[in-house]
Amino acid sequence: MYICSTDKHKPAYIPAFERWSLYKSIWMNHWEEFRKIYDRRFLSKYGELSEAKIEEVEKLLGCGNFQNGFQRYSCEECDVNLIVPFSCKSRLCLSCYRKKLFGWSVNLSHILNLDLRHIHITFTIPGTVSNILFQRRCEVEDMITVAAEVYKKELIKFARLKFKKEEITISDKDWLPGSIATLHKCGNSLNFNPHIHLVGTRAIIHKETKEVLHLSFLRYKKFAFSWMKTFCKHYEKEKVISNAESLVIQNKYKNGFHVYFQPIASEEKEPLFRTSEYIASGFFHNSQIQKVDDGKKEITFRYKSWVEKDTREKSFQDQTIDVYEFMARMLFFLPDPNRKMIRYYGIYANRIMVRHASLEAAAHQPDNSILSQRTWAQAIENSFDAKPENCPDCAKRMQLTVVYSYSARKTIEGLKETHTYLKGYFRPKVRSP
Protein backbone atom coordinates (compact mmCIF):
# COMPACT_ATOMS: atom_id res chain seq x y z
CA MET A 1 0.00 0.00 0.00
CA TYR A 2 1.20 3.54 -0.72
CA ILE A 3 0.08 7.13 -0.51
CA CYS A 4 -0.69 8.98 -3.72
CA SER A 5 -3.23 11.32 -5.21
CA THR A 6 -6.75 9.99 -5.78
CA ASP A 7 -7.03 12.08 -8.96
CA LYS A 8 -7.33 9.69 -11.92
CA HIS A 9 -6.17 12.34 -14.42
CA LYS A 10 -2.43 12.23 -13.83
CA PRO A 11 -0.13 14.78 -15.52
CA ALA A 12 2.69 13.81 -17.86
CA TYR A 13 6.03 13.13 -16.22
CA ILE A 14 8.67 15.70 -17.22
CA PRO A 15 11.87 15.37 -15.15
CA ALA A 16 13.46 18.52 -13.75
CA PHE A 17 17.20 19.04 -14.13
CA GLU A 18 17.38 21.19 -11.00
CA ARG A 19 14.69 21.54 -8.34
CA TRP A 20 13.05 24.94 -7.95
CA SER A 21 9.91 26.15 -6.20
CA LEU A 22 8.48 29.39 -4.85
CA TYR A 23 9.09 28.03 -1.39
CA LYS A 24 12.77 27.38 -2.06
CA SER A 25 13.14 30.82 -3.69
CA ILE A 26 12.10 32.44 -0.40
CA TRP A 27 15.07 30.90 1.36
CA MET A 28 17.44 31.59 -1.54
CA ASN A 29 16.47 35.27 -1.75
CA HIS A 30 16.06 36.15 1.92
CA TRP A 31 18.17 33.77 4.01
CA GLU A 32 21.25 35.99 4.43
CA GLU A 33 19.22 39.03 5.47
CA PHE A 34 17.05 36.87 7.71
CA ARG A 35 20.10 35.70 9.65
CA LYS A 36 21.19 39.30 10.20
CA ILE A 37 17.86 40.47 11.63
CA TYR A 38 16.84 37.30 13.47
CA ASP A 39 18.15 38.14 16.95
CA ARG A 40 16.66 41.62 16.88
CA ARG A 41 13.22 40.58 15.64
CA PHE A 42 12.64 36.97 16.64
CA LEU A 43 15.02 35.79 19.38
CA SER A 44 12.73 36.73 22.26
CA LYS A 45 9.68 35.27 20.51
CA TYR A 46 10.93 32.08 18.89
CA GLY A 47 14.19 31.34 20.67
CA GLU A 48 17.72 30.85 19.42
CA LEU A 49 18.52 30.15 15.78
CA SER A 50 20.46 26.97 16.49
CA GLU A 51 23.25 25.46 14.43
CA ALA A 52 21.00 22.47 13.74
CA LYS A 53 18.37 24.72 12.14
CA ILE A 54 20.98 26.64 10.16
CA GLU A 55 22.26 23.32 8.82
CA GLU A 56 18.74 22.35 7.70
CA VAL A 57 18.43 25.60 5.73
CA GLU A 58 21.83 25.14 4.09
CA LYS A 59 20.88 21.61 3.03
CA LEU A 60 17.64 22.97 1.56
CA LEU A 61 19.52 25.63 -0.43
CA GLY A 62 21.65 22.92 -2.03
CA CYS A 63 18.76 20.56 -2.74
CA GLY A 64 18.52 19.39 -6.33
CA ASN A 65 21.80 21.01 -7.40
CA PHE A 66 23.47 18.56 -9.80
CA GLN A 67 26.90 19.80 -8.67
CA ASN A 68 26.31 18.02 -5.35
CA GLY A 69 26.07 14.70 -7.17
CA PHE A 70 23.35 12.77 -8.97
CA GLN A 71 22.06 9.46 -10.25
CA ARG A 72 22.50 8.98 -13.99
CA TYR A 73 20.18 6.70 -15.93
CA SER A 74 21.48 5.85 -19.43
CA CYS A 75 19.83 3.93 -22.26
CA GLU A 76 22.31 1.69 -24.07
CA GLU A 77 20.09 1.60 -27.18
CA CYS A 78 19.12 5.27 -27.61
CA ASP A 79 21.88 7.02 -25.64
CA VAL A 80 19.20 8.96 -23.75
CA ASN A 81 20.27 10.14 -20.29
CA LEU A 82 18.21 11.09 -17.25
CA ILE A 83 19.87 13.07 -14.46
CA VAL A 84 18.33 12.83 -10.97
CA PRO A 85 20.10 15.16 -8.48
CA PHE A 86 20.60 13.90 -4.95
CA SER A 87 17.92 14.96 -2.48
CA CYS A 88 18.97 17.08 0.48
CA LYS A 89 16.99 15.14 3.13
CA SER A 90 16.44 18.38 5.02
CA ARG A 91 13.41 18.35 7.31
CA LEU A 92 12.77 21.89 6.10
CA CYS A 93 12.60 20.84 2.43
CA LEU A 94 8.98 20.26 1.49
CA SER A 95 9.85 18.22 -1.62
CA CYS A 96 12.17 15.84 0.20
CA TYR A 97 9.70 15.49 3.04
CA ARG A 98 7.04 14.33 0.57
CA LYS A 99 9.48 11.73 -0.73
CA LYS A 100 10.15 10.57 2.83
CA LEU A 101 6.40 10.41 3.47
CA PHE A 102 5.92 8.21 0.41
CA GLY A 103 8.64 5.85 1.60
CA TRP A 104 6.92 5.66 4.98
CA SER A 105 3.54 4.97 3.39
CA VAL A 106 4.90 2.07 1.33
CA ASN A 107 5.45 0.19 4.60
CA LEU A 108 2.10 1.08 6.19
CA SER A 109 0.44 -2.15 5.08
CA HIS A 110 3.14 -4.07 6.98
CA ILE A 111 2.40 -2.12 10.17
CA LEU A 112 -1.36 -1.56 10.31
CA ASN A 113 -3.66 -4.50 10.95
CA LEU A 114 -6.10 -4.08 8.07
CA ASP A 115 -8.55 -6.58 9.56
CA LEU A 116 -9.33 -4.23 12.45
CA ARG A 117 -11.53 -1.14 12.40
CA HIS A 118 -9.82 2.16 13.18
CA ILE A 119 -10.75 5.65 14.28
CA HIS A 120 -9.06 9.03 13.79
CA ILE A 121 -8.95 11.14 16.97
CA THR A 122 -7.71 14.71 17.39
CA PHE A 123 -6.70 15.76 20.90
CA THR A 124 -6.74 19.55 21.31
CA ILE A 125 -6.02 22.04 24.09
CA PRO A 126 -7.62 25.47 24.72
CA GLY A 127 -5.95 28.64 23.47
CA THR A 128 -5.21 29.84 27.00
CA VAL A 129 -3.31 26.63 27.71
CA SER A 130 -1.47 26.88 24.37
CA ASN A 131 -0.31 30.37 25.33
CA ILE A 132 1.12 29.08 28.61
CA LEU A 133 3.07 26.35 26.79
CA PHE A 134 4.36 28.84 24.21
CA GLN A 135 5.46 31.44 26.75
CA ARG A 136 7.27 28.83 28.85
CA ARG A 137 9.02 27.15 25.92
CA CYS A 138 7.46 23.82 26.86
CA GLU A 139 8.35 20.47 25.26
CA VAL A 140 4.96 19.90 23.64
CA GLU A 141 6.15 16.64 22.05
CA ASP A 142 5.26 14.97 25.35
CA MET A 143 1.61 15.40 24.35
CA ILE A 144 1.96 12.47 21.92
CA THR A 145 2.63 9.93 24.65
CA VAL A 146 0.02 11.49 26.94
CA ALA A 147 -2.68 11.19 24.25
CA ALA A 148 -1.71 7.60 23.41
CA GLU A 149 -1.91 6.68 27.09
CA VAL A 150 -5.38 8.26 27.37
CA TYR A 151 -6.55 6.28 24.33
CA LYS A 152 -5.29 3.00 25.77
CA LYS A 153 -6.70 3.73 29.24
CA GLU A 154 -10.19 4.60 27.99
CA LEU A 155 -10.41 1.55 25.72
CA ILE A 156 -9.38 -0.75 28.56
CA LYS A 157 -11.94 0.86 30.91
CA PHE A 158 -14.77 0.48 28.41
CA ALA A 159 -13.79 -3.11 27.57
CA ARG A 160 -13.97 -4.04 31.26
CA LEU A 161 -17.54 -2.72 31.39
CA LYS A 162 -18.63 -4.28 28.12
CA PHE A 163 -17.25 -7.76 28.82
CA LYS A 164 -17.90 -7.82 32.58
CA LYS A 165 -20.66 -10.43 32.32
CA GLU A 166 -18.41 -12.72 30.30
CA GLU A 167 -15.94 -12.77 33.19
CA ILE A 168 -12.95 -11.89 31.02
CA THR A 169 -10.03 -10.54 33.01
CA ILE A 170 -8.84 -7.43 31.20
CA SER A 171 -5.56 -6.01 32.45
CA ASP A 172 -3.73 -3.11 30.82
CA LYS A 173 -0.55 -5.20 30.87
CA ASP A 174 -2.01 -8.07 28.84
CA TRP A 175 -4.44 -6.25 26.54
CA LEU A 176 -3.41 -3.52 24.11
CA PRO A 177 -4.93 -1.44 21.32
CA GLY A 178 -2.74 -0.31 18.43
CA SER A 179 -2.19 3.34 17.59
CA ILE A 180 -0.09 5.68 15.46
CA ALA A 181 0.16 9.24 16.76
CA THR A 182 1.92 12.48 15.91
CA LEU A 183 2.08 16.09 17.03
CA HIS A 184 1.12 19.06 14.86
CA LYS A 185 2.65 22.08 16.60
CA CYS A 186 0.70 24.62 14.59
CA GLY A 187 -2.69 25.22 13.05
CA ASN A 188 -3.34 25.54 9.34
CA SER A 189 -2.56 29.28 9.38
CA LEU A 190 0.87 28.63 10.97
CA ASN A 191 -0.30 29.77 14.40
CA PHE A 192 0.98 28.01 17.52
CA ASN A 193 -1.72 25.43 18.21
CA PRO A 194 -0.26 22.09 19.37
CA HIS A 195 -2.60 19.15 18.93
CA ILE A 196 -2.34 15.40 18.54
CA HIS A 197 -3.59 13.28 15.65
CA LEU A 198 -4.01 9.60 16.46
CA VAL A 199 -5.21 6.65 14.41
CA GLY A 200 -6.15 3.79 16.70
CA THR A 201 -7.77 0.37 16.57
CA ARG A 202 -11.35 0.05 17.77
CA ALA A 203 -10.34 -3.15 19.51
CA ILE A 204 -7.90 -4.45 22.09
CA ILE A 205 -5.73 -7.51 21.52
CA HIS A 206 -4.26 -9.94 24.03
CA LYS A 207 -0.46 -9.90 23.80
CA GLU A 208 -0.03 -13.65 24.21
CA THR A 209 -3.17 -15.34 22.85
CA LYS A 210 -3.86 -12.66 20.15
CA GLU A 211 -7.55 -12.78 21.11
CA VAL A 212 -9.42 -9.70 19.84
CA LEU A 213 -12.16 -7.82 21.70
CA HIS A 214 -13.99 -5.47 19.34
CA LEU A 215 -15.36 -2.18 20.68
CA SER A 216 -17.96 -0.77 18.31
CA PHE A 217 -18.81 2.11 20.65
CA LEU A 218 -16.48 4.52 22.48
CA ARG A 219 -17.39 6.80 25.37
CA TYR A 220 -16.56 10.09 23.70
CA LYS A 221 -17.33 12.38 26.67
CA LYS A 222 -15.06 10.34 28.92
CA PHE A 223 -12.16 10.95 26.54
CA ALA A 224 -12.45 14.76 26.85
CA PHE A 225 -12.32 14.70 30.63
CA SER A 226 -9.61 12.03 30.81
CA TRP A 227 -7.47 13.94 28.28
CA MET A 228 -7.65 17.13 30.34
CA LYS A 229 -6.90 15.38 33.64
CA THR A 230 -3.95 13.39 32.28
CA PHE A 231 -2.57 16.42 30.40
CA CYS A 232 -2.66 18.64 33.50
CA LYS A 233 -1.19 15.93 35.70
CA HIS A 234 1.72 15.38 33.30
CA TYR A 235 2.67 19.05 32.91
CA GLU A 236 2.24 19.65 36.62
CA LYS A 237 4.70 16.80 37.22
CA GLU A 238 7.08 18.36 34.67
CA LYS A 239 6.76 21.67 36.57
CA VAL A 240 5.45 23.49 33.51
CA ILE A 241 2.33 24.48 35.43
CA SER A 242 1.80 24.71 39.18
CA ASN A 243 -0.79 22.76 41.14
CA ALA A 244 -2.80 25.97 41.53
CA GLU A 245 -2.73 26.62 37.77
CA SER A 246 -3.76 23.03 37.11
CA LEU A 247 -6.80 23.41 39.35
CA VAL A 248 -7.77 26.71 37.70
CA ILE A 249 -7.61 25.09 34.25
CA GLN A 250 -9.67 22.07 35.31
CA ASN A 251 -12.29 24.25 36.99
CA LYS A 252 -12.54 26.43 33.90
CA TYR A 253 -12.99 23.49 31.51
CA LYS A 254 -15.27 21.25 33.57
CA ASN A 255 -16.22 19.12 30.55
CA GLY A 256 -12.61 18.57 29.58
CA PHE A 257 -10.57 19.54 26.52
CA HIS A 258 -12.10 19.08 23.07
CA VAL A 259 -11.43 15.69 21.51
CA TYR A 260 -12.69 15.12 17.95
CA PHE A 261 -13.57 11.68 16.60
CA GLN A 262 -13.74 10.69 12.94
CA PRO A 263 -14.60 7.01 12.29
CA ILE A 264 -12.68 5.48 9.40
CA ALA A 265 -14.82 3.48 6.97
CA SER A 266 -14.34 -0.21 7.69
CA GLU A 267 -15.36 -1.53 4.30
CA GLU A 268 -12.46 0.12 2.47
CA LYS A 269 -8.74 0.29 3.22
CA GLU A 270 -8.00 3.52 1.29
CA PRO A 271 -9.58 5.88 3.88
CA LEU A 272 -7.32 4.40 6.55
CA PHE A 273 -4.21 5.14 4.50
CA ARG A 274 -5.40 8.63 3.53
CA THR A 275 -6.00 9.40 7.20
CA SER A 276 -2.58 8.04 8.10
CA GLU A 277 -1.07 10.26 5.40
CA TYR A 278 -2.81 13.27 6.89
CA ILE A 279 -1.46 12.73 10.39
CA ALA A 280 2.06 12.15 9.04
CA SER A 281 2.12 15.05 6.57
CA GLY A 282 4.09 18.20 7.30
CA PHE A 283 2.60 21.44 8.54
CA PHE A 284 3.02 23.26 5.20
CA HIS A 285 2.99 22.39 1.50
CA ASN A 286 4.41 23.98 -1.66
CA SER A 287 0.94 24.18 -3.19
CA GLN A 288 -0.28 26.52 -0.44
CA ILE A 289 1.88 29.41 -1.66
CA GLN A 290 -0.14 31.77 -3.83
CA LYS A 291 2.32 34.64 -4.23
CA VAL A 292 5.74 35.84 -3.07
CA ASP A 293 6.44 39.58 -3.32
CA ASP A 294 10.20 39.96 -2.88
CA GLY A 295 9.95 43.75 -3.12
CA LYS A 296 7.47 44.08 -0.26
CA LYS A 297 8.98 41.03 1.45
CA GLU A 298 5.58 39.38 1.77
CA ILE A 299 4.18 35.91 1.18
CA THR A 300 0.56 35.01 0.54
CA PHE A 301 -0.51 31.46 1.26
CA ARG A 302 -3.81 29.59 1.32
CA TYR A 303 -4.91 27.46 4.24
CA LYS A 304 -7.89 25.33 5.22
CA SER A 305 -9.98 27.46 7.57
CA TRP A 306 -13.00 25.25 8.13
CA VAL A 307 -14.43 21.78 7.45
CA GLU A 308 -18.21 21.35 7.45
CA LYS A 309 -18.99 18.61 9.96
CA ASP A 310 -21.76 16.87 8.00
CA THR A 311 -20.67 17.29 4.38
CA ARG A 312 -16.88 17.43 5.05
CA GLU A 313 -16.77 20.35 2.60
CA LYS A 314 -13.62 22.45 3.09
CA SER A 315 -13.37 26.24 3.20
CA PHE A 316 -10.13 28.11 2.49
CA GLN A 317 -8.71 31.54 3.25
CA ASP A 318 -5.67 33.47 2.04
CA GLN A 319 -3.24 35.07 4.46
CA THR A 320 -0.43 37.53 3.73
CA ILE A 321 2.41 37.87 6.21
CA ASP A 322 5.94 39.26 6.36
CA VAL A 323 8.35 36.86 4.66
CA TYR A 324 10.76 36.93 7.61
CA GLU A 325 7.92 36.08 9.99
CA PHE A 326 7.07 33.14 7.72
CA MET A 327 10.66 31.90 7.78
CA ALA A 328 10.86 32.28 11.56
CA ARG A 329 7.68 30.26 12.04
CA MET A 330 8.83 27.50 9.68
CA LEU A 331 12.04 27.13 11.69
CA PHE A 332 10.24 27.34 15.03
CA PHE A 333 7.83 24.54 14.12
CA LEU A 334 10.61 22.38 12.66
CA PRO A 335 11.00 19.18 14.73
CA ASP A 336 14.27 18.77 16.60
CA PRO A 337 16.92 16.50 15.01
CA ASN A 338 16.51 12.78 15.67
CA ARG A 339 13.15 13.31 17.38
CA LYS A 340 10.57 10.71 16.37
CA MET A 341 7.47 12.64 15.34
CA ILE A 342 5.44 9.60 14.25
CA ARG A 343 5.16 7.21 17.17
CA TYR A 344 3.72 3.73 17.46
CA TYR A 345 1.99 2.28 20.51
CA GLY A 346 0.53 -1.01 21.66
CA ILE A 347 0.44 -3.75 19.06
CA TYR A 348 1.86 -1.36 16.44
CA ALA A 349 4.98 -0.73 18.51
CA ASN A 350 5.87 -4.41 18.08
CA ARG A 351 4.95 -4.49 14.38
CA ILE A 352 7.14 -1.46 13.58
CA MET A 353 10.12 -3.05 15.35
CA VAL A 354 9.73 -6.18 13.25
CA ARG A 355 9.38 -4.11 10.08
CA HIS A 356 12.47 -2.01 10.88
CA ALA A 357 14.47 -5.19 11.44
CA SER A 358 13.44 -6.60 8.05
CA LEU A 359 14.26 -3.33 6.28
CA GLU A 360 17.64 -3.17 7.99
CA ALA A 361 18.39 -6.69 6.79
CA ALA A 362 17.22 -5.88 3.26
CA ALA A 363 19.43 -2.81 3.13
CA HIS A 364 22.51 -5.03 3.53
CA GLN A 365 21.55 -7.36 0.68
CA PRO A 366 23.35 -6.77 -2.66
CA ASP A 367 20.11 -6.76 -4.64
CA ASN A 368 18.56 -4.09 -2.41
CA SER A 369 21.40 -1.60 -2.17
CA ILE A 370 19.41 1.14 -3.89
CA LEU A 371 16.25 1.15 -1.77
CA SER A 372 16.01 4.94 -1.87
CA GLN A 373 16.15 4.96 -5.69
CA ARG A 374 13.32 2.46 -5.80
CA THR A 375 11.26 4.63 -3.47
CA TRP A 376 11.77 7.55 -5.87
CA ALA A 377 10.81 5.39 -8.86
CA GLN A 378 7.69 4.06 -7.11
CA ALA A 379 6.62 7.58 -6.18
CA ILE A 380 6.95 8.76 -9.80
CA GLU A 381 5.11 5.71 -11.10
CA ASN A 382 2.18 6.19 -8.74
CA SER A 383 1.99 9.96 -9.26
CA PHE A 384 2.42 10.09 -13.05
CA ASP A 385 1.75 6.55 -14.32
CA ALA A 386 5.27 6.55 -15.74
CA LYS A 387 8.29 4.31 -15.19
CA PRO A 388 11.17 6.78 -14.77
CA GLU A 389 13.82 4.05 -14.89
CA ASN A 390 12.74 3.14 -18.43
CA CYS A 391 13.88 4.95 -21.56
CA PRO A 392 11.18 7.39 -22.81
CA ASP A 393 11.91 6.37 -26.43
CA CYS A 394 12.38 2.58 -26.48
CA ALA A 395 10.90 1.80 -23.02
CA LYS A 396 13.86 -0.42 -22.11
CA ARG A 397 15.24 -0.22 -18.58
CA MET A 398 18.12 2.25 -18.35
CA GLN A 399 21.42 1.58 -16.61
CA LEU A 400 22.06 3.37 -13.33
CA THR A 401 25.37 4.92 -12.31
CA VAL A 402 26.04 7.23 -9.38
CA VAL A 403 28.05 10.41 -10.00
CA TYR A 404 29.48 12.15 -6.95
CA SER A 405 30.17 15.85 -6.48
CA TYR A 406 33.88 15.75 -7.40
CA SER A 407 33.08 14.64 -10.97
CA ALA A 408 29.53 16.00 -11.34
CA ARG A 409 30.34 19.23 -13.20
CA LYS A 410 32.74 17.51 -15.61
CA THR A 411 30.15 14.82 -16.39
CA ILE A 412 27.42 17.37 -17.11
CA GLU A 413 29.72 19.50 -19.29
CA GLY A 414 30.61 16.39 -21.28
CA LEU A 415 26.93 15.56 -21.76
CA LYS A 416 26.15 19.08 -22.96
CA GLU A 417 28.80 18.79 -25.68
CA THR A 418 27.24 15.67 -27.18
CA HIS A 419 23.60 15.91 -26.10
CA THR A 420 20.69 18.34 -26.14
CA TYR A 421 18.56 18.83 -23.04
CA LEU A 422 14.94 18.35 -24.13
CA LYS A 423 11.85 17.77 -21.96
CA GLY A 424 13.82 16.57 -18.99
CA TYR A 425 16.24 14.25 -20.82
CA PHE A 426 19.68 14.59 -22.43
CA ARG A 427 19.27 13.31 -26.00
CA PRO A 428 22.06 12.83 -28.60
CA LYS A 429 22.60 15.82 -30.86
CA VAL A 430 21.59 15.30 -34.48
CA ARG A 431 24.76 14.98 -36.53
CA SER A 432 25.12 16.68 -39.90
CA PRO A 433 25.31 14.27 -42.87
Predicted ranges, named:
Residues M1-P433:
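Beta->alpha loop/short-helix hinge microenvironment recognizer with preference
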